[in-house]
Amino acid sequence: MPKYHLKAPYSPKGDQPTAIARLVEGVNQGQRYQTLLGATGTGKTFTIANLIAQTGRPALVLAHNKTLAAQLCNEFREFFPDNSVEYFISYYDYYQPEAYVPVSDTYIAKTASINEEIDMLRHSATRSLFERNDVIVVASISCIYGLGIPSEYLKAAVKFKVGETLNLRSSLRELVDNQYSRNDFDITRGRFRVRGDVLEIGPAYEDRLVRIELFGDEVEAIRYLDPTTGEILQSLEAINIYPAKHFVTPKERLNVAVQAIRDELRERLQVLNEQGKLLEAQRLEQRTAYDLEMLREVGYCNGVENYARHLAGRSAGTPPECLIDYFPDDWLLVVDESHVTCSQLKAMYNGDQARKKVLIEHGFRLPSAADNRPLKSEEFWRKARQTVFVSATPGDWELTQSDGQLAEQVIRPTGVLDPLVEVRPTQGQVDDLLAEIRIRAKKQERVLITTLTKRMAEDLTDYLAENDVRVRYLHSEIHSIERIEIIQDLRLGEYDVLVGVNLLREGLDLPEVSLVVILDADKEGFLRAERSLIQTIGRAARHVDGMALLYADNLTDSMARAISETERRREIQKAYNELNGIVPRPAGKRASNSILSFLELSRRLQTDGKDADLVQITGRAVDALDSDQDSGLALDALPELIDQLETKMKEAAKNLNFEEAASLRDRIKKFRQKLIRNT
């Protein structure tokens, strides 16, 4: 059993010990499905961390978006600093899939921008699954897409061991076959160079270099190096260098795949010609012939993923292998915010197939392109082993699958009760709301307001701003990482009120919010259903004086059930506090998200400084750094500033400007020390 070392400054409290014990017992007894029904702020992540530590299973934690996945990954890394906690999301900064619009005869080619840092994290996850058993992978729903063939990926790894004889030419050929490229001047991820008896490799899964030192034909030493300074970081006895891409196709299989593609093309052309679709047949023949030529010559072509079924040797209709297939047999699945995530799993396949069907019908792709797809919902659950659903409002499907295997977690370790819920009439609601906002603002507390329409949210935001309220408006067009920045500004007190159409956002931690306002609460629909109301009310559940105001003229069934459930939990919490002499206290979580800061910084640096907001922020910071007047810099800004200075330092070193690089190094050291002292 792998040894997880759970480190936390506190122990399980309230009903956490009972929930942990029940879940651990269920896993050990082989229960297929269980549900953790945990109210907002009760420490569900800590409970799951204890479950993983006590069962010792490799775990996949599935979240419904990359924002929540990053938040969970940060928390698990704090709980398990000595274990492998990995982050696996889609590596596209921008993605426009291939499509065809028959009405306007418009073909849209695939365009994408890959984030190299996310790609590195994805490779790090699969490498850890091959080499360790104490692995927790926090992933978004993108993990159900094809990810090569695990057995081929493992078999293709180039192995080096101290003392063994090495055929350097053969090893270099293997690296090239594994999508590494030779560059003797600028070595980064996915590249290698040879200097005399020294081979240096930039592995796809980390930012350190690997140096293989030879004495004749014998491997004399294997070392990890700092890519900028060349400093030796660690010596190794052996190492596996995994492919630079997850899709690895041996030459013999490639030849078989090319023949299979040619056979399918011949059959498809016959069908199209019989249907009188001569234009489509000509288009398909030209495109596929070009792709086949590229595959034969260089082993790659644009849109190669559309031939994934042939390259993997799969039969028609069979599911692709994905991240799940890299896990060992005894892995554990945790589905966070399962009432949303499980629904996403069902929707992914249908959306993908609708687009592919049009491309196939009009001669842009072979029918086998439809098998380059995400898993169907039923395929995913067949692959899944033991599963724990986690939600404050689990869906009916999860509860049915769990069949009574339910662990409820209602009591917060902080002693904070569920919010008071009050229903008020809509007449005069805006003036009443304005008065409530002013009360909270004086106490430096925050307010969330959720409306039914975008227009209503815009009008309300304008009205509040005209009345000297510090307010921001959150809408669907805002980039997910910019959204995090807006929420962090709310937490840091840059403004007092956040208005939006859908602010329930499962898993969002906002301890500063003391008031949640739901306008038009009696308008039945998705945004005012029982689960949505409970989730929205829960945004104030981390504040000692949390309150939810529902403006409505009628009491709907959804409202009644949501209010009843909130009151039930509140009574349980109050009774527990009185019995144990607990006084509610604030949660006090820091407003930070290191993974998102890291990824966003990378994305913006790749725009070559075109992002005005970044220039404005970093300009002030660099001025402060240059003048050594750093006392006014916020702690939350330091990780981003350090990352920027490291980039500048590496560029200076690359340009042989060593004095500037040394100066930047000293500043980085100073800011790291400040960060350590204050965290």
Curated annotation (Swiss-Prot):
Organism the protein comes from: Prochlorococcus marinus (strain MIT 9303)
Keywords assigned: ATP-binding, Cytoplasm, DNA damage, DNA excision, DNA repair, Excision nuclease, Helicase, Hydrolase, Nucleotide-binding, SOS response
GO CC term, one of those recorded: excinuclease repair complex
UniProt GO molecular function: ATP binding; ATP hydrolysis activity; DNA binding; excinuclease ABC activity; helicase activity
Domain notes: The beta-hairpin motif is involved in DNA binding.
Lineage of source species: Bacteria, Bacillati, Cyanobacteriota, Cyanophyceae, Synechococcales
Domain UVR: 639-674
Chief place of localization: cytoplasm
Protein name as annotated: UvrABC system protein B
Chain positions of motif Beta-hairpin: 91-114
Location(s) in or outside the cell: Cytoplasm
UniProt domain Helicase ATP-binding: residue ranges: 25-190
Residue span, Helicase C-terminal domain: 429-591
InterPro entries with a match to the protein in the record: Helicase/UvrB_N (IPR006935), Helicase_ATP-bd (IPR014001), Helicase_C-like (IPR001650), P-loop_NTPase (IPR027417), UVR_dom (IPR001943), UVR_dom_sf (IPR036876), UvrB (IPR004807), UvrB_inter (IPR041471)
SUPFAM superfamilies tied to this protein: C-terminal UvrC-binding domain of UvrB, P-loop containing nucleoside triphosphate hydrolases
BP-aspect Gene Ontology terms: nucleotide-excision repair; SOS response
NCBIfam families, A to Z: PRK05298.1 (NF003673), uvrb (TIGR00631)
